[in-house]
Each structure stands twice: as structure tokens, then as C-alpha cells.
Amino acid sequence: MKVHLVLLIAVATSCAAQTNSPSATPAAATPEVSFQFERAGLPVPKFTIVVHEDGTGTYRGEEAPVSGGARAAALQPASPGRPIDRPIKLSPPTVDAIFKTARSLDHFNIPCASKAKNIADTGKKTLSYSSPDGQGSCTYNYSENKSVTQLTETFQAIAFTMDEGRKLDFLHRYDRLGLYSEMDVLIHEVQEKRALEVGNIAPSLTSIVADEALMQKVRERAAKLLAQANDSGSKSN
């Protein structure tokens, strides 16, 4: 009986020690930059990209609700859009540029929205910075600050790539003939730097390259993009 009691005390002591161990202490916050975007009428009307200084991050959003048209909408509400939650990994040059710009803009503690009137609605955007060394955010539709504009273009180009990856997956499964023109679109956007960090959709491209049932030109385009992504990754390491 005494032995049993001693064992119980030992187990309890061990559990208490584990509870109070340093490993249970919450990890210190690490620097992160986020970009939020909202604009009704788009396939993805709302999304958020979060980037940590080690290059890891997330792309989260929600696809637009699916509706069967005005008549169907009168009978029942549109189905909610599917949630999007994807991990991302950005190259060191992109990460360095993002954090360097954020710090040069006082962690976004600046008035970044343009005061000009009659500007077209291009979507509500919010840049945020959070870290032990400071935090801040600014919201805008359009900004005349060149650094803010450049960051906006970077994040939107990353979002485009992520959305394109989902589109390629869909076409690969349901509309293989549509892959031909879509690959042309993606290659063009990469050339124009409106699609960045293509390595994040490498699984989608690899799946296309490996599918011998697809058109050879489609597979060649996917292989070309994969090679470019791998080349960019090796140069940044």
C-alpha cells in the first residue's frame, strides 16, 4: 500500500514538474506582417496573408458564395463560399523586402490612404505589423506612398498565385482542356511579375507534369514554371 502511494506521489510530482517546466511557457511573439483585402464581387472577395520573418506564413480567405441565379436566390439563400487555408513559404528576398519596408514605414503607423477624391474602389486593404519591437497598421483603398503600393502589389501577386493553384487543381480534375489556356495565363502573369512565389503551388504543377494523359504542351508549361521556381529558390539560398 505504501509503495502504491509512493508511486502516486511520484507521478503527481512529475506531472507538476512538467506543468511548470519552461517548455510550457508561451513562446515569445515573432515579427509578422499581414495583408488583408476585401472587395465584393471577386471570386475570393476577402483574404488575409500572414508572413513571419522566417518566411513561413498562411493564406486564408473565403470563396464567393455560390448562387444559382436570381430566381434560385429568391427561393433559398446562396451557399456559403468554401474557406481557404493554405500554408505558404516565401523566398528570402521577398521576405526581406516585406520586413524592410514595414520597418521603414514605422510599422505602418503612418497615414497611408490617399486623400484624393473620386478614386475608384479597388478594395479595402490593411497592412499590419506585429512584433515585440513595435506594432501598427494602416488601412487604405488607394495609396500614393510608393512603398505601400509596392507591398500591395507583392501581396496581391502572391494571392494570385495561390488562387491560380486552386484553379489548376480544379481544371486538372474537371476540365483538362481548360488547362492549356490557363497555363498560358499563369506564365504571362509570372513574366509580368503579377504572380509571385510560384513554388507555393509546386504540388499542383508537379501533378500536371506527371499526368501523361494531358497534352504535352500543358505538361511542358508546368515543367517550365517548376524549373523557374526551383531556380529562384536555389539562387535565394
Regions found by a protein language model. Name each.
Residues A16-G41, P111-N237:
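Short, well-ordered, aromatic-rich surface patches in folded extracellular/luminal domains
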Residues E53-G55, E63, T94, A102, ...:
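A mature extracytoplasmic/lumenal domain signature
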Residues T56-R86, D184-L186, A202-T206:
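Acidic/histidine-rich, surface-exposed loop or edge segments in extracytoplasmic proteins
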Residues T48-H52, G69-A72, Q76, G81-L90, ...:
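Short amphipathic beta-strand/extended segments with alternating polar/hydrophobic composition
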Residues S91-A116:
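Charged, amphipathic alpha-helical segments
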Residues H4-S14:
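Bacterial N-terminal signal peptides
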Residues A24-R71, L75, K100:
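N-terminal secretory signal peptides
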